[in-house]
Amino acid sequence: MDILKKLQEEFGITQSQAENTVRLLDEGNTVPFIARYRKEMTGSLDDQIIRQLSERLTALRNLEDRRTQVRTAIAEQGRLTDALAAKLDAAQTQTEIEDIYRPFRPKRRTRASIAKEKGLQPLADIIWGQKLIGTPEEAAKAFVDSGQGVDTVLDAINGAMDILAEQISDDADLRKLLREETIKCGAIVSKKTKDEPSVYEMYYDYREPLKKAAGHRVLAMNRGEKEGFLSVKIEGEEEKLLQRMERRLIRRSSDTADILRGVIADSYKRLIAPSLEREIRNDLTEKAEEAAIGVFRENLRQLLLQPPISGKVVLALDPAYRTGCKIAVIDATGKPLETTVVYPTPPQNKTAEAEKKLLALIEKYGVDLISIGNGTASRESELFVAEMLKKTKRRVQYIIANEAGASVYSASKLGAEEFPDYDVSLRSAVSIGRRIQDPLAELVKIDPKSIGVGQYQHDMNQKRLGEALGGVVEDCVNSVGVDLNTASPALLSYVAGIHAAVAKNILKYREEHGKFIARRELLKVAKLGPKAYEQCAGFLRLPESEMPLDRTGVHPESYAAAEGLLALCGYGLADVAAKRVSGLAKKIKSPEKTAAELGIGVPTLEDIMRELEKPGRDPREDAPAPVLRSDVLSMEDLQEGMVLTGTVRNVIDFGVFVDIGVHQDGLVHISQICDRFIKHPLEAVKLGDVVRVKVLSVDLQKKRIALTMKGI
């Protein structure tokens, strides 16, 4: 297989794009570095495409490795023919390669191998030849041998049938045909195994064609089966498939047709069907997991790239009942100022005392915003806060923060290192406050799998999920850029070219030498060599550096070009520092000529111009601002037809959940997102979007809210 050609076809890219991107990856360059600083070589492929290409490259190389292993194994048996080698070369998937290898794979002792040990292979060959002199029984008499355990003619025929059944099940072309037919006409079927209510009730008597099986339903059935509520199986059109096999394998003039029909039925029911069922279910699950990981990736990307609410003093409230609500007041830089615990919720209900304490904190520190975690007791805490805010003269608003993962962080080694003197619960409160001020900087401290914006994330391959989500975090961190002098080791470890040990060395260097004053100073950090510097330098910013270009996303390798461009346009570095640079595109007549003159490509020229005009620009500024509230709404207040503004909290295969401020997210089904047909909600909306929705229905008993985004 020509891997480069395959990548070209699958990604719709040119030969040079494929060759250059693969070469850059093989040279050890990181995805963010390639996407940002090697655009001329990749044809400006973005980080998501390059990451997908990298994953596909690994998969295709693994496929080639397996092809080589199989070819070697067959050759060592002395059974590799030209036809077999050609078949192996033509195989496009792992399944096809394994089908070809199946007859040659070392097997455990089977009914067929036992029959072969008894000397019945020649009889099997006679029956398979389908031309007899006399009857099958007469042919079988010669193989009766009590010493071999073949006591009767029937024993001989049955043994030969076992050999042929396995032989048929090992036919790669036949397996491919049956697999394709099953997928085309078969169904996934689930039945209940327990006569009791559960979240899987819709699957208690469920059937869906395989070619239409939705990924989220496949994963739901898998979970229901794992938890003991469902039995799940693949059903093919057995009679139709048996007829196809008979037409393919039995000649019209066959003298052994009746025996072969029995062989075919046994081969299909005992060997082929169970094997195909496992393969098809594994394939369905793998595809469903990949789709779910894709949604999780996009949700995580949008969550991490939520705009920070900067410059505000935040009072964070981590709700609870018996143990009280943990409070942390955090200044505009994220530094905790004071922590305490109040008890406004049941069973203590010390509302007046809690109110007095929090109002005092609001006045003492000039609190601008209250961040309330959305976990246990969140609703009661929100009601308490809304009432309390009516009693302060300051303009204070509140926001409901997604606290998923806060408890994981607070109990982690990282949480203990950051706040060794704080109780675990108070660390959670600090995290809830900080993730409003700068979601990216805070959320990188938490395992992405714990952030809770995916479907069935605990049911899938955790290694694959971890790799995929880690890539998303890396891309987000590098697209925003990191302040070298303030970033935590957790944030630094996601910067291109920097791993956890180097991140700690950067922190150690800061502690020993004070703030970095220039990017090139990074080369003095232990274990950070020239290659790592090349990868990370452009993503690390120094807002106070005397070198204005250190404050931007311009890579040090392009400083000379940037200064040359400034000179051509009548500017200097002082203008960059003073943010006076503008209209560069109008000042150069030909981008191609200017780029050539500066020794760079046009894409790099365009990136440099953007950075010089808006040094240190945060791409998150373009996202819609979070919805802040000052009063509370309850489900009982909702009326059919009411139009509200909300924030998309989660995107899943069948719709989106929207926070409309009633503590119970409403569901916009995929059919209610827009007037045009969409295959997936992500085609029209993403996590963090601020949207207008209309209430379709409210079920107070089941706590369900149905919303629409159509006709507003």
Residue ranges and their predicted role:
Residues 12, 307-308, 474-508, 630-668, ...:
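C-terminal accessory/binding modules appended to enzymatic or scaffolding proteins
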Residues 139-147, 151-153, 206-207, 242-272, ...:
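Low-complexity, acidic/Ser/Thr- and charged residue-rich accessory regions of DNA metabolism proteins
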Residues 179-188, 317-321, 375-377, 401-408, ...:
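A glycine-rich phosphate-binding loop feature that marks nucleotide/adenosyl-phosphate handling sites
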Residues 96, 399, 405, 410-480, ...:
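Long, charge-rich intrinsically disordered scaffolds of nucleic-acid metabolism proteins
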Residues 30-31, 42, 46-147, 479-622, ...:
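Accessory alpha-helical DNA-binding modules that contact the DNA backbone or grooves
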Residues 49-52, 59, 63-316, 320-410, ...:
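Duplex nucleic acid-engaging cores and interfaces of nucleic-acid transaction enzymes
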Residues 279-297, 450-481, 596-640:
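Long, charged amphipathic helices and adjacent flexible linkers at domain junctions
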